[in-house]
Amino acid sequence: MATSASSHLNKGIKQVYMALPQGDKVQAMYIWIDGTGEGLRCKTRTLDSEPKCIEELPEWNFDGSSTFQSEGSNSDMYLVPAAMFRDPFRKDPNKLVFCEVFKYNRKPAETNLRHTCKRIMDMVSNQRPWFGMEQEYTLMGTDGHPFGWPSNGFPGPQGPYYCGVGADKAYGRDIVEAHYRACLYAGIKIGGTNAEVMPAQWEFQIGPCEGIDMGDHLWVARFILHRVCEDFGVIATFDPKPIPGNWNGAGCHTNFSTKAMREENGLKYIEEAIEKLSKRHQYHIRAYDPKGGLDNARRLTGFHETSNINDFSAGVANRGASIRIPRTVGQEKKGYFEDRRPSANCDPFAVTEALIRTCLLNETGDEPFQYKN
């Protein structure tokens, strides 16, 4: 099993230093999305005291030419703190700081999708939009081979691995447990975890989160997963179809509701939202992965519990549909619906913004509407 060189360093020696007192100083790790729209970057600065709110955190900058975000001749980019969490790696009073990225002219960077998403969320805050996102991922060795798979072949076919227990069914649970506890410590709204259908594939759920919090919490949960995997010497990939062939892909099913949907006879509003979504399928497919639908085309085949990328469908308890209404929601006539189209590597800001635009702002057509400030 190929693991990284860093994971073989003596962690006991490191712990000697991590146990040293740090006085009144605080380490703040600033985290941002790079120019790929998928990768995360981070760097740390020292603060003189523990920040109590986001406003107490200073802006910072970085070299955008090294993160696919600018040219070397004008490479300074600004980091503007947006959300703060406890640091599960360095522990209290240290912080994780999720940032928006702005260019030299103070305009949002191309992959700063949070900026517009926040404006859209603020327009509908009175409707109390809630989201829950189910993040699937696959554990890989540093050689790009799925964790625990035979080096020269494949494990047994899918069937026993989903929510499986046992050394021959669950591959890499230590990482899952470490990530779960680290998220709870950080203050991430993590709802749960489970082993997925393909061996070495796992899922964690974030939510319910209201409005912009959905993207903040999911991105930082992804960062924590990458850092935990770094310590274990393996890689977490959000590729929506990491292994071609008769293996399940990886999605980020998104559950959505408004206050009206959650109240008595809310099913009426759920059905109205689904009707709007049915008329804007291609717009959503473009928003649901970083490559405008190309990544999802490998996953949304109509097989392996997915819908076909070219067709819109909806149904109660149907995991082969674009939109699934859970059976309990159909029975209680209120609740939420699940959009099964987003890919595992989607930007949650793009996904949640698209749902708000179509379902609550009643947008139509293939392009998002440009609202005046």
Curated annotation (Swiss-Prot):
Keyword annotations from UniProtKB, A to Z: Acetylation, Angiogenesis, ATP-binding, Cell membrane, Cytoplasm, Endoplasmic reticulum, Ligase, Lipoprotein, Magnesium, Manganese, Membrane, Metal-binding, Microsome, Mitochondrion, Nucleotide-binding, Palmitate, Phosphoprotein, Transferase, Ubl conjugation
Post-translational modification N6-acetyllysine, affected residues: K11, K14
Modified residues (N-acetylalanine): A2
Amino acids binding ATP: E134, E203, F204, Q205, I206, G207, P208, N255, F256, S257, R319, R324
Localization, UniProt: Cytoplasm, Cytosol; Microsome; Mitochondrion; Cell membrane
Entries under PROSITE patterns matching the protein: GLNA_1, GLNA_ATP, GS_BETA_GRASP, GS_CATALYTIC
Binding site for ADP: Y336, F337, E338
Domain GS beta-grasp: 26-106
Record comment: activity regulation: Glutamine synthetase activity is inhibited by methionine sulfoximine (MSO).
Binding-site list for Mn(2+) 1: E134, H253, E338
EC number: 6.3.1.2, 2.3.1.225
Annotated SUPFAM superfamilies: Glutamine synthetase, N-terminal domain, Glutamine synthetase/guanido kinase
GO biological process: angiogenesis; glutamine biosynthetic process; intracellular ammonium homeostasis; positive regulation of erythrocyte differentiation; protein palmitoylation; regulation of endothelial cell migration; regulation of sprouting angiogenesis
PTM summary: Palmitoylated; undergoes autopalmitoylation. Acetylated by EP300/p300; acetylation is stimulated by increased glutamine levels and promotes ubiquitin-mediated proteasomal degradation.
Residue ranges annotated for the GS catalytic domain, each copy included: 113-373
Keyword Transmembrane helix: no
Catalytic activity, reaction form: L-glutamate + NH4(+) + ATP = L-glutamine + ADP + phosphate + H(+); L-cysteinyl-[protein] + hexadecanoyl-CoA = S-hexadecanoyl-L-cysteinyl-[protein] + CoA
Region (Required for glutamine-induced ubiquitination by CRL4(CRBN) and proteasomal degradation): 2-25
Modified residues annotated as Phosphotyrosine in this record: Y104
GO molecular function, one term: metal ion binding
Cofactor field: Mg(2+); Mn(2+)
Family of this protein: Belongs to the glutamine synthetase family.
Subunit structure: Decamer; composed of two pentamers. Interacts with PALMD. Interacts with RHOJ. Interacts with BEST2; this interaction tethers a fraction of GLUL to the membrane, causing a decrease of cytosolic glutamine synthase (GS) activity and inhibits the chloride channel activity of BEST2 by affecting the gating at the aperture in the absence of intracellular glutamate.
Function: Glutamine synthetase that catalyzes the ATP-dependent conversion of glutamate and ammonia to glutamine. Its role depends on tissue localization: in the brain, it regulates the levels of toxic ammonia and converts neurotoxic glutamate to harmless glutamine, whereas in the liver, it is one of the enzymes responsible for the removal of ammonia.
Protein name, entry field: Glutamine synthetase
Gene: GLUL
